Amino acid sequence: MLFRSDLKPLLKRKDIALVSLDYKVEDKIDGVYYPECAENTENYDDLAALIAELDMVIGVPTTAQHCAAALGVKTWCLVPKYHQWRYAQPVMRWYNSMWLVHQTQLDDQVYKDGKLTFTRRDRSWKEVIEYVEKKL
């Protein structure tokens, strides 16, 4: 599971501005723009208009990722190690503008009292974020 806090290294970059396309964000990070249109999950017109104005979209597989790629916006999709079949290749077969960045290690997962919890979660996504940062 990728956490917003995992993206903090990208905040150090002065040449990029981060815009959250998530909805119902509770743990907001300073330095990230949270547009109101991302909160409206019943009408994606405003969100699609915002996405069309972005230079690039980076994030885990979501509706926003697919919308960005369908609009032709350069999109890097951060794919978990265990993923659905459509994310198996380095590129998405339906969109020329989507490139898939695969996680190569798993988070350390522990079942405790019947609930899945994560320990040392930063170990696996750290390498993905470092790779993305180098490629930007």
Per-range role (PLM):
Residues 8-76, 80:
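Donor-binding and catalytic core of enzymes assembling or modifying cell-surface/extracellular glycoconjugates
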